[in-house]
Amino acid sequence: MHGHNRNGQAHVPRRKRRNRFVKKNGQCNVYFANLSNKSQRYMADIFTTCVDTRWRYMLMIFSAAFLVSWLFFGLLFWWIAFFHGDLEASPSVPAVGGPGGNGGESPNAPKPCIMHVNGFLGAFLFSVETQTTIGYGFRCVTEECPLAVIAVVVQSIVGCVIDSFMIGTIMAKMARPKKRAQTLLFSHHAVISVRDGKLCLMWRVGNLRKSHIVEAHVRAQLIKPYMTQEGEYLPLDQRDLNVGYDIGLDRIFLVSPIIIVHEIDEDSPLYGMGKEELESEDFEIVVILEGMVEATAMTTQARSSYLASEILWGHRFEPVVFEEKSHYKVDYSRFHKTYEVAGTPCCSARELQESKITVLPAPPPPPSAFCYENELALMSQEEEEMEEEAAAAAAVAAGLGLEAGSKEEAGIIRMLEFGSHLDLERMQAATLPLDNISYRRESRI
């Protein structure tokens, strides 16, 4: 039951706007919840986890890894020096051959495990110098403590592993084809208008770089809630929109902006949808552009989506490619602009198809029937002429007193036939109509 506002008008509650499944920038608006063993699964694939992590978090992780390793081995070196008694020695005793040393160290003085490490700060600095291979030459490990030598070897290996992992992750993250999708552009709106006599859904794609996308092809899917015949509710039912898979129109040469066309035919989910239905429908069209990056041969994918409110009925895109004197110019300031087309039908493609009444002319008679009718007419005309000639010959023969079947009668008949043929030729040359009797018989046929 609808409420009323203060003016007494009925208040119709507005339907909640549909959440995007795919955002305009291509990110999927999906949140995963209640995943069992999520941390263990992500740590099992630590490289992919680091590559997918944002830059700030990745740098924090590697910085923390370096600090932890330096602190751990610094504490280990301090512990070795402490138990060896190096920290109890006088800090003024110079190292053999070291800076400020004269090489005149007392032979009875104990030899430390790590030279010039007199506290935790010195051990930490030695750890940093060892792992980063700075090599100042002031602190060094002696052969007094094999444990300290082993610790130096282990720290060197750990440092190489961390460096390799960090460099590989950064390179993989920088070379990801996902960033190439940032220079692939989709129009802000999609349009529906008539093209080649049929309603078509169209949107525009473009490449902002001069480097090509190899084997570029497009796909489109319509996503909307769907209720099955058994009563099962599917909140995100996906249906393909044909953009020319069967004839290869889905593969494009993306040098300049191209308009992708989906013909709304009997197989299209938009076939029974008109302008009014479009404004009230709840669906989303996800468009996908895939191809290989020319520089790295890695597959990249760019995505975008259009809600029903972002589809303009009866509009077309403004042209962006213009032919100059020696080249073609692409004006990207017109990339998202459209203009309204007058006379675009507001009905659905189904209603438009049903309203087309095509009156086909009656097919002409086959050549065999035409010849047969003319043949009958000519045969009837020849029979009539032969009867008239025979009657005339009989009358002449009777007047001359000749017997039937004589040679003279046959000659007279041939003369009459010759005369009748001459008369017929004159009549055809003068394009005179046939006599009433032959015309009447022909019409009967």
UniProtKB/Swiss-Prot annotation:
Cellular component terms per the entry's GO annotation: cytoplasmic vesicle membrane; glutamatergic synapse; monoatomic ion channel complex; postsynaptic membrane
Disulfide bonds: none
UniProt effect for mutating E442A: Abolishes interaction with TAX1BP3
Catalytic reactions of this protein: K(+)(in) = K(+)(out)
Residues in compartment: Cytoplasmic: 1-55, 170-445
Extracellular face residues: 81-119, 139-147
Motif PDZ-binding, residue numbers: 443-445
Subcellular location, record wording: Cell membrane; Postsynaptic cell membrane; Cytoplasmic vesicle membrane
Motif placement: Selectivity filter: 133-138
Positions of transmembrane segments: 56-80, 148-169
Single GO term (MF): inward rectifier potassium channel activity
Gene3D superfamilies assigned to the protein according to its UniProt record, in alphabetical order: 1.10.287.70, G protein-activated inward rectifier potassium channel 1
Tissue expression pattern: Highly expressed in the forebrain, moderately in skeletal muscle. Im olfactory bulb, specifically expressed at the postsynaptic membrane of dendritic spines of granule cells.
Intramembrane intervals: 120-131, 132-138
Site (Role in the control of polyamine-mediated channel gating and in the blocking by intracellular magnesium): D163
Function: Inward rectifier potassium channels are characterized by a greater tendency to allow potassium to flow into the cell rather than out of it. Their voltage dependence is regulated by the concentration of extracellular potassium; as external potassium is raised, the voltage range of the channel opening shifts to more positive voltages. The inward rectification is mainly due to the blockage of outward current by internal magnesium. Can be blocked by extracellular barium and cesium.
UniProt xrefs under PANTHER family: INWARD RECTIFIER POTASSIUM CHANNEL, INWARD RECTIFIER POTASSIUM CHANNEL 4
Oligomer and partners: Homomultimeric and heteromultimeric association with KCNJ2 and KCNJ12. Interacts with DLG2 and DLG4. Associates, via its PDZ-recognition domain, with a complex containing LIN7A, LIN7B, LIN7C, DLG1, CASK and APBA1. Interacts with TAX1BP3. TAX1BP3 competes with LIN7 family members for KCNJ4 binding.
Family label: Belongs to the inward rectifier-type potassium channel (TC 1.A.2.1) family. KCNJ4 subfamily.
Stated name of the protein: Inward rectifier potassium channel 4
Native source species: Mus musculus (Mouse)
Originating gene: Kcnj4
